[in-house]
Structure formats: structure tokens, C-alpha cells
Regions:
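A structural-propensity feature for long, helix-poor, extended segments
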Residues: 74-95, 338-368
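Alpha-helix capping and helix-loop boundary segments enriched in small/acidic/polar residues
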Residues: 32, 80-86, 120, 145-152, ...
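Accessory "access/gating" subregions that flank catalytic or transport cores
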Residues: 27, 133-134, 142-151, 162-170, ...
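Active-site cavity-forming subdomains of large catalytic enzyme subunits
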Residues: 33, 37, 41, 45, ...
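Active-site-surrounding "flap" and adjacent substrate/cofactor-binding loops of secreted or lumenal enzymes
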Residues: 52-83, 89-92, 109-123
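Bacterial Sec-dependent N-terminal signal peptides
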Residues: 1-21
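Glycan-recognition surfaces in beta-rich domains, encompassing non-catalytic CBMs
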Residues: 373-483
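Catalytic phosphate/nucleotide-handling subdomain of diverse soluble enzymes
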Residues: 49, 56-69, 186-189, 197, ...
């Protein structure tokens, strides 16, 4: 009898779960497009607003009395002055193009090859991932910390916006795409940063406040991860001290400003770690109280990657409110460049608006939603928590040594530990002198000279790496496509 009763109870419980209604988001074609446009526009506005301060305030915030400019013609000015500023956008565009041409079910390998052979400048985890793929190291190995010391950097985080836009209110689908894309260049907290951003955008289509958006987005990141703990600290701190964002900034500085991986930032005040910069995103969303202007201003004034962070904040709020509700003060300068083509792509903002809209509708239908007669219905499903992955566990940098020398033949050094990173640049002396290179590179720790080659210089330096008398591997360092880190 006891067994029969138990079976009956389980059967009744299962029937009860199946009977629970699924929450559905209903909106019109026009409303969906408006939100998608708002995401792209807010993202681009944020990256331009933070342009003059990017990594110029490391270990400090920007004082309230210091003006940050914005005016008519300002977006066009930065478009012409520094095309590489828009890496937040053109990396997204590469993947949007890939999904458009290869289909929504395209493989990780197909996406990796599109990314690795895109003709624009990359840095940090993106550049290391590109190098790995071009050497035959495919994802997820290309983003693994043992092959990519930038694995915890925020690269995937700054190019994951498009995922939430093509998967509106569809968190499980957003995380599936994030897993395919994010492990091309990142892993661990670096991967979680992009998954978090994708979830922020996706949930912004139906959540009504920054608090709710953050709560939903962080719920998919494993609680055991340092990324989750860092973002949760921001949420908890804000609940206790909701008035002054600088108090939260100091708290984060003390507890979480500790990068152990990025070769450019280790032992320095430069921090491009995903969790710290995502924490600044969360901080700005909470203390900005949903106001577009205040939120991107706070995200910028937090410092470090102060163009990418307001870019994410602006994009998420752009989705929540929609394109038409972004203040004209911000939107009008953007409209000047909406038809301009991003570097290394065939994409403009105008094309991105439409392409993301089309992809979103395809994915909605594919996953059981409805698109009919100008009306859209999206079933909102619970997403599973991502698997736990952590980089650099029980691994810490021991020392940083500065050499400031040219490698023209051989270079030898001794080290203690289980690994090393040599960080530098390959430079062409056709147009500049070794003296100039030396003066720039020794200006301060972290100074670098961009690879000044002809635009299509085919030269590739071959550098043999020998360890304990045995050839470990041969590094191929191209002059083309911007700087090539040793």
C-alpha cells in the first residue's frame, strides 16, 4: 500500500506542474522593432559617450565636476576619428552577418572562422582567440585560459549585445547562442560576462525595471562562480545603501579589483576583467534608477573600460524603453551615422536594426512562438543555470619584469613557476625609427606601439619558443590586421 500511495502522489504532482500556465509576452511588430532599434542605438550612444575617457581613469572614478562632452555631430566626429572605437558594435555585426548567411543553427566552428578572418583590429581575448583559430586551435580551446591568458577579459561581454536582441524574452535560446559564440574568445568569468549581457538584453524585453532585469540575468550564472558573487555583491550593497553610487564603487575597488590573468593589467591599475566591469554595469543600472542619462553617466564615471560599460547600460535601457523614447539629445547625433558601414563589415546600424528584427522573428517561430498579422507572442521560459567554469584556479602571477628591448635575434630568461607570458608588439621600421619605438614603449608600463605596417603588409614574423632546451612551438606574428602581441 505504501508503494501505491507514493506513486499516486508523484503522479498528481507531475500533473499539477504541467497544468501551470506559461507566461507569454505579447507585442506588435512595431513594438519589437522599436525595442531592437533601441538596443543597437543605446549601445552605440554609450560607446561614443565614453570614448574620451576609455581606460584613462583606472583605479579612480571621474569626478562629478569633470564634464564629458556630447553634442550635435559628436558621433560622426568619433566615427571619422577612431573607427576602432566601435569594436563593441562591429564585432556584434560580424556575428549578425554570420547568422544571417549561415542560418540560426550555424556551428561554433563556422562562427569562429567568420570572426577570426574579419578584416578589422582586435585586442586582448579577441586577438588571442583570433590567433589561436588561425593556428588551428578551435573553440572552446581557443578561449580556454591555458591557451588564452585574456580568458577572463571582457571581450565577449562587449560583443554579446546582439544575442539578446535576436533572442528577445528567450533566455534559453540566448544562452545557447552565447555558448556557441562566447567560447571562441573567452571562458570562465569572461564567458559569464557575455552570457550575463545577453541575458540583460533578452530580459529587458519583458522586465519593467533595472532591478528586475538584473535579477533575471544573474540568475543564469552559477552562484559558485566569482562572477555571480561579484554582481550579487552590487545588488546587496545597493539594497542597503541606495543613495550614493561612489560608496558602492569603493566597495568594489577594495574587494574585486584584482586581475590575475590579463598580461597588460596584472600588478597594474589597468583592469579589463569581466566581472569588475560588469559590476560597474550593474551599479549604473541600479543607482541610475532607470534614467537613461544618469545611468550611462554613472557607468562612464566608474572608469576602467568606460566606453564599453555605458554601451551595455545604454543598450539595455534602449531595449526596455524603445528607440522612440531615447531622449533626442542623445538620439539626434546618432542618426547622422545610421547608414554608415562599420569597419570590416557590410553592416550599418540601419541594416543591423532590420537584420536583428528578422532573426528575432525567425527564432520566435522556431521556438514555439507566434508571428502573425503584425502581432507577436513569445512564451517566456525559465533558463537553466550555466555549467560552472572558473579560470586560473590556484594560479596566481608571481612577478612582472620589464625588459624594454628589441628582439632581433634571441632573447633568454629564467623564470620560476609553471608558465609565463611575453607581452609586446611587432613593429615595422619602414616609417618610424627604433628610437621612436623605444621612446613610446618606455613611456610607462603598458605603453605600446601599434604595428605600423603598410595596410596590406604580408610579413609574418616566425618566433621559436624554446623551454629547457626543447622547441615548444613556433609563434607566427603577422604585421597585417593591427597589432600582433608576442
Amino acid at each position: 500500500m505504501r508503494k501505491i500511495i507514493t506513486i499516486c502522489i508523484i503522479g498528481l504532482f507531475a500533473l499539477n506542474v504541467q497544468a501551470q500556465p506559461v507566461k507569454t509576452l505579447k507585442l506588435s511588430d512595431k513594438e519589437l522593432l522599436d525595442k531592437i532599434k533601441g538596443g543597437w542605438a543605446g549601445q552605440t550612444i554609450g560607446v561614443v559617450f565614453g570614448a574620451p575617457t576609455e581606460f584613462k581613469f583606472t583605479g579612480t572614478y571621474i569626478q562629478d565636476y569633470q564634464p564629458i562632452p556630447w553634442a550635435e555631430g559628436y558621433v560622426k566626429y568619433w566615427w571619422e576619428k577612431k573607427p576602432g572605437l566601435f569594436d563593441d558594435i562591429y564585432n556584434d555585426c560580424t556575428f549578425v552577418e554570420a547568422f544571417d548567411e549561415l542560418g540560426l543553427d550555424c556551428s561554433q566552428e563556422e562562427l569562429a572562422k567568420r570572426f577570426a578572418f574579419a578584416d578589422y583590429h582586435l585586442a586582448h581575448a579577441n586577438q588571442a582567440g583570433r590567433y589561436n583559430i588561425r593556428q588551428g586551435i578551435m573553440p572552446p580551446a581557443s578561449g580556454h585560459w591555458l591557451n588564452n591568458p585574456h580568458a577572463d577579459d571582457l571581450d565577449f561581454q562587449i560583443e554579446a549585445d546582439f544575442i539578446g536582441l535576436m533572442a528577445p524574452a528567450m533566455l534559453p535560446e540566448a544562452l545557447d547562442i552565447a555558448s556557441r559564440v562566447g567560447h571562441i574568445m573567452n571562458s570562465g568569468d569572461g564567458f559569464y560576462g557575455g552570457a550575463f549581457v545577453a541575458a540583460l538584453y533578452s530580459s529587458a524585453f519583458y522586465e519593467k525595471s533595472p532591478e528586475a532585469i538584473l535579477k533575471t540575468a544573474i540568475s543564469v550564472i552559477p552562484e559558485e562562480s566569482t562572477f555571480h558573487q561579484c554582481i550579487q555583491d552590487v545588488i546587496n550593497f545597493h539594497s542597503l545603501h541606495p543613495d550614493n553610487w561612489k560608496d558602492c564603487w569603493y566597495f568594489l575597488q577594495e574587494k574585486w579589483n584584482c586581475d590575475v590573468g590579463c598580461p597588460k593589467g596584472v600588478f597594474l591599475n589597468f583592469n579589463i576583467d569581466a566581472k569588475l566591469n560588469s559590476a560597474f554595469i550593474a551599479l549604473a543600472m541600479l543607482y541610475g534608477k532607470g534614467d537613461f542619462t544618469n545611468s550611462i553617466d554613472i557607468a562612464t564615471r566608474c572608469g576602467q573600460d568606460s566606453d564599453c560599460n555605458p554601451s551595455t547600460v545604454g543598450g539595455v535601457l534602449g531595449v526596455m524603453y524603445g528607440y522612440d523614447k531615447i531622449p533626442s539629445f542623445w538620439l539626434n547625433p546618432l542618426k547622422e551615422v545610421e547608414d554608415f558601414t562599420f569597419e570590416g563589415t557590410n553592416m550599418s546600424l540601419a541594416k543591423a536594426y532590420q537584420m536583428s528584427f528578422d532573426q528575432a522573428k525567425q527564432l520566435i517561430v522556431k521556438t514555439g512562438g507566434k508571428v502573425s498579422g503584425g502581432e507577436i507572442e513569445i512564451p517566456i521560459k525559465r533558463a537553466d543555470i550555466l555549467p560552472l567554469e572558473q579560470n586560473f584556479e590556484k594560479t596566481y602571477p608571481l612577478y612582472r619584469e620589464r625588459k624594454d628591448c628589441f628582439l632581433t635575434d634571441t632573447f633568454e630568461f629564467d623564470f620560476n613557476g609553471n608558465g609565463f607570458v611575453i607581452w609586446g608588439n611587432i613593429c615595422c621600421t619602414k616609417s618610424i625609427t627604433p628610437d621612436y619605438i623605444n621612446r613610446v614603449s618606455t613611456r610607462h608600463i603598458g605603453s605600446e606601439v601599434f604595428g605600423l605596417a603598410e595596410p596590406n603588409d604580408p610579413y609574418v614574423a616566425k618566433v621559436e619558443i624554446w623551454i629547457d632546451g626543447e622547441l615548444d612551438h613556433v609563434a607566427a606574428l603577422p604585421m597585417k590586421l593591427g597589432r600582433a602581441h608576442v
